[in-house]
Amino acid sequence: MPFRSNNPITRDELLSRFFPQFHPVTTFNSGLSGGSFLIEHQGQRFVVRQPHDPDAPQSAFLRQYRALSQLPASIAPKPHLYLRDWMVVDYLPGAVKTYLPDTNELAGLLYYLHQQPRFGWRITLLPLLELYWQQSDPARRTVGWLRMLKRLRKAREPRPLRLSPLHMDVHAGNLVHSASGLKLIDWEYAGDGDIALELAAVWVENTEQHRQLVNDYATRAKIYPAQLWRQVRRWFPWLLMLKGGWFEYRWRQTGDQQFIRLADDTWRQLLIKQ
């Protein structure tokens, strides 16, 4: 149920107007991009979410609502309410673990997602790379960072192997191990893009695990594993730049030192930070 209003409302107003029987239970602060809170009434639970990035356009939050509205409940929470700065979705019962599931199980989830109808908007990385450069702390910008940005701008993004709806933030903290199987939460970066971009973006523990995930996916998708791995590798520089830039952007927004540490580690992987 989308509800349009130009006037933001408070949490208490949201609950009293739309969920008067519900009461807050707990707050989640998992992940690097923010939190949400849980409301409950007679055993029924919903998650109340706000935009993780206060500077992002409202259209980005609306896209997340639209993505959830068209995804099957077997892989994502169903949304119940959208209005400015607020979204209410189903709570997914299950375990959120600190490590990825078996690669074959994860490959099955991603392959099923990629078989769904496209969302209708493309993920393009270059505008984000340029935004993060522009919005970062000037003292943190380096010649190497700018050089890599120009190199990617000239090279352009890899041509998609297959264009599908993507989640784009697959890591252990966004996977719910439910009684009916794996499900994904936090769809704020969802959009249409290359399946290899999704696979490249998974937060794996090591290269061996990454290769196995790609191999398992290739078997399901009937793609030569070597061909898919080559395409995944083409996205690596783009994703490292995306991660490094996002950490720098969040550092300037929040002043949280964890983002500096994560950015420095990412730049070391790219060998562009002196």
UniProtKB/Swiss-Prot annotation:
Pathway: Cofactor biosynthesis; thiamine diphosphate biosynthesis; thiamine phosphate from thiamine: step 1/1
GO biological process per UniProt: thiamine diphosphate biosynthetic process; thiamine metabolic process
Disulfide bonds: none
A Pfam family this chain is assigned to: APH
Sorted UniProt keywords: ATP-binding, Kinase, Nucleotide-binding, Transferase
EC number assigned by the record: 2.7.1.89
InterPro entries: Aminoglycoside_PTrfase, Kinase-like_dom_sf, Thiamine_kinase
Catalytic activity: thiamine + ATP = thiamine phosphate + ADP + H(+)
One example GO MF annotation: thiamine kinase activity
Alphabetical list of NCBIfam families matching this protein: PRK10271.1, ycfN_thiK
Function description: Catalyzes the ATP-dependent phosphorylation of thiamine to thiamine phosphate. Is involved in thiamine salvage.
Entry similarity comment: Belongs to the thiamine kinase family.
Protein name: Thiamine kinase
